[in-house]
Amino acid sequence: MSYLLALDQGTTSSRAIIFDEKGQIHATAQRETRIKTPNSGWVEQDANEIWSSQIAVIQQALASAHILAKDIKALGLTNQRETTVVWDKRTGKALAPAIIWQDRRAAQWCNTLIENGMLVQVQQKTGLRIDPYFSAGKLVWLLENIAGFRILAEQGHAAFGTIDSWLVWNLTQGAEHIIEASNASRTMLMNLSTQMWDEDLLNKFNIPAAILPKIISSDAYVADTAQGLLGSTIPITGILGDQQAALFGQSCFEVGSAKNTYGTGCFMLFNTGDQLQFSQNQLLTTLAWQCQNQTRYALEGSVFMAGAIVQWLRDGLGLIQHSAQVEQLASQVQSTEGVVLVPAFTGLGAPHWDSEARALLCGMSRGTTKAHIARAALEAIAFQVSDVLCAMQSDLSRPLKELRVDGGASQNDMLMQFQADILNVPVLRPKMLESTAWGAAAMAGLKAGVFTNLDEIAASWQLDRTFEPKMKNDERESRLCEWSQALKRAKSNLI
């Protein structure tokens, strides 16, 4: 039996999962990581805590599975994207807190770029919108605000990276300073056409090239873990950003295949093959993966509020005590009776990108109950995904045959059925919902010879349930119209 170790470093926790070659889980370990918000719009984590939590769960998972590091065939890594870490190469110590992808402190810098007419240029080069979401603005802020950092960077003594870079640096005890291609594509610094750092953008952003890591393919043999770290060395042979890892783990290898991950937010990725497709509908173009000497691209739509809506029902309104109770509450009514929730608590993501939009709950009457609100909350998740898919299909002129789903909220049968109904597309839920971690493990296994091709990985994907569309066309159109009207009222230009 071949064991594969997946490291899944997310926004709220560090995890380690041990799989076999069939995708069966043999051990899981998890440790939460703290998030700090020292100022309005700032979101940070302790980079050293990220590393210490990750090494701790590796050791815990090995102990739980009753195996040794020498029994692991390969290590795969997946991570929260865009999050930015800088450190001193000489000491290996972080020079500042990790700036998390949700952080908005670079908003003014981004606005200045937009005012200077760089929006189209940045999209054509990187596939991304100018937004504080991406790493470039975070790095510029650090260079301008951390005392002595720019000098260290120009002297070649400082390093920048995303979370994959930081973990690999520590796993190899400073031997490797790299960034994997799908992660690099989220920095707003990599040219998607050349798959190299864009010198023109670096000059315009005043970022020293000496600070940047080497871009490597998703299936590169990076190095072995350092001697003495885990008892025996383990080859690091697969790295992917978390959403790209989920696309790979869902075996969405064919052009036109798509997955949607239901977590705190929603992230839909649509495989566009080896062709760069630049969106005309405010979606992101991203690198899906590089493996077996081939590059695959994707269109991505990011929705800010999904599982977070259920958390609001629990913590903000007190309608439920536990998130899992939302389906039971919502099922007490057959419809929302006209109640619509637009969950723009932090603005609207793709394809609207309206940071000033505000949440709206409308259509209520004296007969409205908490069950109607709970049902409207679940439907709001599906409506937002529908907006993303509509934009994707407009860009690609290609109908979606099926949508593969994962993430915690995909276990909600009511939500998945409504998602299928409102999309008019079958929704497929796999038996194993750890698609992100499995994607990293499978990529590592492909390089390590556990798998010889993508078909062998695809064979491990097993269906749990298909949710077929049941809603009549006129009802679907009516519901989408209700959503559209509520959305217009929530957007900033109408408040």
UniProtKB/Swiss-Prot annotation:
Pathway, per record: Polyol metabolism; glycerol degradation via glycerol kinase pathway; sn-glycerol 3-phosphate from glycerol: step 1/1
User: Could you tell me the keywords of this UniProt record?
Assistant: ATP-binding, Glycerol metabolism, Kinase, Nucleotide-binding, Transferase
Instruction: Write out the GO biological process terms.
Output: glycerol catabolic process; glycerol metabolic process; glycerol-3-phosphate metabolic process
Q: Which reaction does it catalyse?
A: glycerol + ATP = sn-glycerol 3-phosphate + ADP + H(+)
Task: Give residues annotated as binding sn-glycerol 3-phosphate.
Answer: T11, R81, E82, Y133, D242
Its function?
A: Key enzyme in the regulation of glycerol uptake and metabolism. Catalyzes the phosphorylation of glycerol to yield sn-glycerol 3-phosphate.
What family does the Swiss-Prot or TrEMBL record give for this protein? Belongs to the FGGY kinase family.
Query: What is the protein name given in its UniProt record?
Result: Glycerol kinase
Species this chain originates from? Acinetobacter baylyi (strain ATCC 33305 / BD413 / ADP1)
**Name of the encoding gene:** glpK
